[in-house]
Amino acid sequence: MTLENRPDEAGSPDNGEGTAGPITPAMLEAAERLAGINFTDAERRTIADTMDEQVGIFARRVKMGELPNDLAPALVFRALPPGRALDPVTSTGDPGLIVGKAGPCPADETDIAFASIGELATWIRRGDLTSERLTDIYLRRIDRLDPELHCMITVTADRARRQARAADAALAAGEDRGPLHGIPYGAKDIVDVEGIRATWGAAPFRDRVASTTATVIERLDAHHAVMLGKTAVGALAYGDIWFDEKCRNPWNLEQGSSGSSAGSASGTAAGLMAFSLGSETYGSIVSPCVRCGATGLRPTFGRVSKAGVMSLCWSLDKIGPITRRTVDTAYVLAAIQGLDPRDPSSVGVPFASDPERPIEGLRIGWNPAWFESAGDADRAVLDHLRRSGCRMVEVDLPTLPWESLLVPLYAESAAAFESLTRDDRDDEMVWQAPEAWPNTFRRSWFIPAVEAVQSDRVRRMAMNAMAEVMEKVDALALPPFAAGLLLITNATGHPTLVLPTSEDGSTPSGGFTFIGRLFDEGTLIRLGRSVEQGLSPRTLRPPLG
């Protein structure tokens, strides 16, 4: 195929909206600074003579109209590097089995609200508690506490009560759908539920009503889980500022919850729901869980379907659970994971979990440099791992320009919301700081195409480097933001479990992360369960009214 003699290109092509006149050598010379390259005057003249054709190609694509947000690029990211077999896993158990023992159902409704999924599920099956009563407990807490927390965008009380009554009736008829049967939860407001507002946390979309239902919601519905409503999300999945408010940290109402799974972390930590759905592109589960004292599991890329969920970066977005206890993440992941034809990046790899299995003998990768600024709570986790019989293996990653891994995030997000920028609707966004999305989308238009491809090649290098490291260990242990591994592992697709840490046993002091091999979330859950039992046996409760 050639570009010569195209019959529709007689004369000067349409350069597209916003392009005034021909591209000149002087324009190209100024643009060279953006690309970090230099051409001669003669080269610039030759380029300028041929640029109209290139700009015309772009303009004709724009005239197609807005592309739907859920239309993924033709090239689909796979976390498993080509030629590599699946990593071994250390778990074989059924993640749907309720582990641990539940005592009597407490009389105090606050104690019920902060109970684990396993405890709630046991009480419901004993007949000590109904889903309808539990749902009402959470709805009352939302009514009372959300005016301070601003963690809910839409409360679906009527739908929740209908689901709760149906769950109770099904259980009474002998139909048990597993640990999540009758358990109330919140869904981050980038997740669609047909007929319900899904605002993406952004003013331009505040009146958007979903016309389809996300796969994750369909799967939770099938388990008779009860959706309480849509949790606050930083606008277009960044930060904790949404179109009406700033979601608050339940431990410090003067502070934002971080984000972008802002309301999911805040509401779960505050006992407004038993669990929630979050998402992460670059820190959006890990960061708010650290801030709010919640537990979060970012699954392997492709493990959980994104169909019916707002796309920010098609090759980076991941859906995962936020809970108050580690084993609860296993129950939720077991329900929502699995192959989905609606999501081209979805994969079908079995998920197993043995949370009660001892961690003795597990190989834990770490590096002293990762803990140079660590606090006592972080070092206590390392001590626990050693006492429990883990083999500590010092590891390191090669020196690479890891910041290049941000380029796909910038480019994909700007593409996902191109029309927002072109139509000047980005001006409607509440957060307009230099680091906020409106400015990031605008400057991403100046990423050179060659640089976008080269950054993707650096991403392949990162995948290979992580694969070599994970051949030596079963998991990595580190503070959440150490050594750039939050960025690296989001780019490579590796799973991460984040746990709250506490210096005094009653208030969160930060968080700790375990990074696992691809599709081996079960090992992370074993580790997290062991750390909880050894260091944090009590659920942290914010001092709310």
Model-derived segments and their meaning:
Residues 106, 110-116, 146, 182, ...:
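Gly/Ser-rich, acidic/histidine-flanked active-site/gating loops
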Residues 127, 182, 188, 222, ...:
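Glycine-rich, small-residue loops and helix-cap segments
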Residues 212-336, 479, 490, 494-513:
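Short glycine/serine-rich loop segments
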Residues 128, 133-139, 165, 169, ...:
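Acyltransferase
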Residues 98-103, 298-379, 534-545:
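A short helix-breaking turn/cap at a secondary-structure junction
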Residues 98-109, 180-200, 358-367, 407-463, ...:
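Short helix-loop capping/hinge segments that flank enzyme active sites or metal/cofactor-binding pockets
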